[in-house]
Amino acid sequence: MNITVYHASCAEVKNPSVDVNGENLGFGKGFYLTNSKAEAEAWARKIAAENGKDANPIISVYEFNYFKTKNVGYRFNEFETYNKEWLNFVVDCRKGKDVTADYDIVIAGGLDNEIADIVEDYENNNITAEEAVEQLRYNDVKFQICILNQEIIDFNLEFVEQLTM
């Protein structure tokens, strides 16, 4: 069974690579996707705004064979909710710690501006982990997928189309 997923950018990405996105992101260095078209649109607008007036928000659409990927034996790290384990994982990734080496793919709640602010407050010791988790529980989990293993992209992710906004 395939799942439609989206990648936000300023360019069409027909041949994705795990080396595209930087190392100190929420789930480390990898290729980031979401299963929410609305989230992808919001991210594409943000990325385009950060890249100047000539940048156009673009969404690349893919079909991802989640169940085949899961059943073949790739190593998944999945968080269904925002919790203390998720919080510490994200903080470690943002600090550049190599916490993703044991995984091929991470699926978890992503970091929009509000979530990122809470994580930063925790990182800066302005709030405790318990306070952060309490604040996070009021937010809907907007799932993000970070593929860390190029083989998953090459054999389980198929480009469908580009959407220019």
Language-model-detected regions and their locations in the chain:
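A short, exposed loop/beta-hairpin motif centered on an aromatic-Gly-Thr core
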Residues: 27-32
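Short aromatic-glycine-(Arg/Gly/Cys) micro-motifs in beta-strand/loop hairpins
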Residues: 1-26
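Conserved NAD+-utilizing ADP-ribose enzyme module
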Residues: 2, 25-26, 41-42, 46-165
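Short, well-ordered alpha-helical microsegments
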Residues: 15, 40-41
